[in-house]
Amino acid sequence: MSKRYLFTSESVTEGHPDKICDQISDTILDALLSQDDHSRVAAEVVVNTGLVLITGEITSKAQVHFVDLVRKKIAEIGYINADNGFSSNSCTVLVALDEQSPDISQGVTAAQENRELLSNDELDKIGAGDQGIVFGFACNETPEFMPLPISLAHRIARRLAAVRKTGELSYLRPDGKTQVSVIYEDGRPVGIDTILVSTQHDATIGDITDNDLVQQKIKSDLWEAVVQPVFSDLEIKPDANTRYLVNPTGKFVIGGPQGDAGLTGRKIIVDTYGGYSRHGGGAFSGKDPTKVDRSAAYACRYVAKNIVAAGLADKCEIQVGYAIGVARPVSLFVETFGTGKVADDVILDLINKYFELRPAGIIQTFNLRGLPSERGERFYQDVAAYGHFGRNDLDLPWEQTDKAAILKEALTSAVV
């Protein structure tokens, strides 16, 4: 008998309060690394009605006007009208930053760190910026090697923002959330059970003032302008049995920071795999690459994606453990959920042979310090909304599958 079940993942738009904070944190990171690529950054942001607070620890030679950066990013997201309860021009921006603790810095700093290319021995001398566990995951459910539920939730969220920004649905406001429940049979997606969209909107639409009629129009417009285009190129589509919910509370006029306070790092499941894979608990945004919460999670995704792309497994999850001030991981674990074409121990040996998981090595391999300046002072802020993984719209080093051929060849040689 086949096993049938549902799995649900959610996403949020760039105007969600927590995502505003993530994007501001990473905009600050981009600006600092663009001027000083060895900046140490742990930028935390809080937003509330009419207020932005920047706090955390930063050690950098860069000269950055934080208030201007914040206002520009808020305007880019779409909060330019005080009627939304939050505006780039009128919000108060407070800055309360400290320098990184020297007790932490001494564990991750080495004399060789400022060199562009480090030897193997030198990489061993630069430790992790903190203890922690990180996970990476990939599967072959989608072309981008991501689970289908989070892939669809992100697609809908991005499309929702796009039709707002282009003016196609000009009554939409920046805040929004999406959620998709996918039907699985024997571990493979076969259909769509539920699509949920909650979107902030104007109280009236043209001459329509009755809220029930407003909601009817929003629901109809979103189906035509958002949902149908998202599924147009996919084999799995909504059908007559799919539940389609829009603003199920009845309306969503008050939103953004006026509706809820936001905080950096509160959407870690949205940022990763939508709950389909485990999470080590550390957030990404606002952290420079010495923080393994971020850089090592990117590396683990790279490892898992190449393993699946090489055909060694249909699903692969990697866990790596780190100790502060220690370069080499204290643990490495592989799980293929019974889908591996070879034993997990064989895959583990291939990872140890072909992948770099020391923090300084990860930074060097992916050029994580240099990318912001190379890409016009914006790199990390572009992954701060709509997911850090599976982003075929961005050229991300950890999304490359350049090791897949090497893994295939190594495995073939070992078998022969």
From Swiss-Prot:
Record keyword Cytoplasm present: yes
Needed co-factor(s): Mg(2+); K(+)
Binding site for ATP: H16, D175, G176, K177, K251, F252, D260, R266, K267, A283, K287
Residues making up the signal peptide according to the UniProt record: none
Annotated PROSITE patterns: ADOMET_SYNTHASE_1 (PS00376), ADOMET_SYNTHASE_2 (PS00377)
Record-listed E.C. numbers: 2.5.1.6
Lineage top rank: taxon: Bacteria
GO cellular component terms, semicolon-separated: cytoplasm
Region named Flexible loop: 100-110
Pathway: Amino-acid biosynthesis; S-adenosyl-L-methionine biosynthesis; S-adenosyl-L-methionine from L-methionine: step 1/1
Keywords: ATP-binding, Cytoplasm, Magnesium, Metal-binding, Nucleotide-binding, One-carbon metabolism, Potassium, Transferase
Residue sites binding Mg(2+) per the record: D18
GO molecular function: ATP binding; magnesium ion binding; methionine adenosyltransferase activity
InterPro entries attached to this UniProt entry: ADOMET_SYNTHASE_CS, S-AdoMet_synt_C, S-AdoMet_synt_central, S-AdoMet_synt_N, S-AdoMet_synthetase, S-AdoMet_synthetase_sfam
Binding note for cofactor: Binds 2 divalent ions per subunit. Binds 1 potassium ion per subunit.
GO terms classed as biological process: one-carbon metabolic process; S-adenosylmethionine biosynthetic process
Location of the protein in the cell: Cytoplasm
Family statement drawn from the similarity comment of this UniProt entry: Belongs to the AdoMet synthase family.
Functional description taken from the UniProt entry: Catalyzes the formation of S-adenosylmethionine (AdoMet) from methionine and ATP. The overall synthetic reaction is composed of two sequential steps, AdoMet formation and the subsequent tripolyphosphate hydrolysis which occurs prior to release of AdoMet from the enzyme.
Subunit structure: Homotetramer; dimer of dimers.
Protein's name in the database: S-adenosylmethionine synthase
Species name: Microcystis aeruginosa (strain NIES-843 / IAM M-2473)
